């Protein structure tokens, strides 16, 4: 097994005190274009169509991945409760199951998978602590969807010193020694969303961008890809404001400065409460919805909203419902990333106009394959593209689309 980490305890104590953060340049986005998952499946895996679109195709199978008996792979996500993250887990589990079947491993000989994620989605400190715990278990490889692209450098250095490769998936990291990045081409996908939204509002007017956080590369790439497309091809459309769900403190100060009216003060109080150290998820969700409502009141002429993931989309639709802006003449158009069951219902009900549906199952599967390839010294592509497609109410019931929903 790997050599013991004689410096582990001391260094991790320092990491906890300093926050374990580092800086560097962002990983480049992938190059995959919009794809529709094929309807055909191979015997034994109903999700084979999710694997057929992976580029390169080698990441859609486990042939030649002869891992040692009892090997353990750690996969660390940014969440675990949403449909997206459940699909990532499912894909990763299937890859490990395929490895065990292919090698004939049973019982204690099986290759093992441990999936972990912050209790509260996108909790940076919790994810860093999880990474510490997983590294202490001596996995053969780690796959991580980094909440904060600048965090975990100390932990990654420790992993490198002990021969544990790190694969990034979904959202990249600034760390320079990542062996592969498994993700959607967020920049291109967001540009597709921008083009569709601008077209739906008549290529003129104001729109808002609501992003899931200000730290992850997935959020940054989607934001940039969307804005760049608008600026390049839709000169009569204006991005009125970009707001991140974790920017509650800044918007609280703005609300307080903007008005002393009762409703605005209540909104500011809710936002401030969510910023408190022990605030629960309900406080945070209420504050985020209040902030979105404030932005819509600040920009009364907004005609469309881009939500960068399903969490944001749910918040946006809840607010629009409360303001009677999901139907009728005052309806505000919404496009979003992700395609879980709840979002498909919103799409069917006409409360969301279009979705960039990713391939989380393929992301999970390919991440395990990349981890195994790294362990075996087989080499990896710097970027593995997992595909996406544009889904609307008009095409959501097509067989080729249904195969990629989660």
What are these regions (language model features)?
Residues 16-20:
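C-terminal motif of bacterial Sec signal peptides marking the signal peptidase cleavage site
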Residues 3, 22-406:
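A residue-level marker of the well-folded mature domains of exported/periplasmic proteins
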């Amino acid at each position: 097994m790997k050599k013991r980490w004689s410096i582990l305890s001391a260094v991790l104590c320092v990491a906890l005190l300093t926050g374990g953060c580092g800086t560097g340049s962002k990983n480049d986005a992938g190059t995959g274009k919009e794809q529709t998952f094929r309807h055909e499946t191979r015997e034994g895996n109903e999700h084979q169509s999710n694997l057929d679109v992976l580029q390169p195709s080698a990441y859609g199978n486990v042939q030649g991945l002869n891992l040692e008996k009892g090997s353990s792979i750690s996969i660390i996500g940014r969440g675990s409760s949403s449909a997206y993250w459940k699909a990532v887990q499912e894909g990763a589990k299937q890859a490990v199951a395929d490895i065990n079947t292919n090698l004939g491993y049973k019982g204690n000989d099986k290759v093992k998978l441990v999936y972990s994620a912050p209790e509260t989605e996108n909790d940076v400190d919790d994810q860093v602590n999880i990474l510490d715990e997983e590294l202490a278990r001596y996995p053969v490889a780690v796959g991580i969807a980094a909440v904060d692209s600048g965090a975990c450098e100390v932990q990654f250095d420790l992993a490198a010193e002990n021969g544990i490769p790190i694969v990034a998936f979904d959202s990249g990291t600034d760390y320079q020694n990542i062996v592969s990045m498994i993700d959607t081409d967020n920049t291109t996908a967001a540009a597709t969303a921008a083009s569709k939204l601008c077209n739906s509002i008549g290529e003129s007017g104001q729109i808002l961008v609501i992003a899931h956080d200000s730290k992850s590369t997935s959020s940054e790439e989607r934001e940039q890809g969307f804005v760049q497309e608008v600026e390049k091809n839709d000169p009569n459309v204006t991005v009125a404001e970009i707001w991140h769900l974790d920017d509650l403190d800044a918007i609280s100060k703005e609300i307080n400065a903007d008005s002393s009216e009762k409703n605005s003060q209540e909104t500011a109080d809710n936002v401030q409460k969510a910023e408190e150290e022990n605030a629960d998820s309900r406080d945070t969700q209420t504050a985020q919805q209040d902030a979105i409502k404030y932005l819509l009141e600040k920009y009364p002429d907004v005609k469309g909203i881009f939500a960068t993931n399903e969490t944001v989309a749910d918040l946006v639709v809840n607010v629009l419902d409360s303001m009677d802006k999901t139907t009728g003449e005052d309806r505000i158009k919404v496009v979003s990333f992700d395609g879980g069951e709840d979002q498909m219902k919103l799409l069917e009900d006409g409360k969301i106009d279009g979705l960039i549906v990713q391939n989380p199952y393929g992301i999970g599967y390919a991440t395990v394959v990349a981890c195994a390839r790294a362990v075996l010294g087989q080499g990896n592509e710097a970027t593995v593209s997992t595909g996406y497609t544009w889904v609307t109410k008009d095409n959501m019931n097509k067989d080729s689309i249904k195969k990629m929903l989660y």
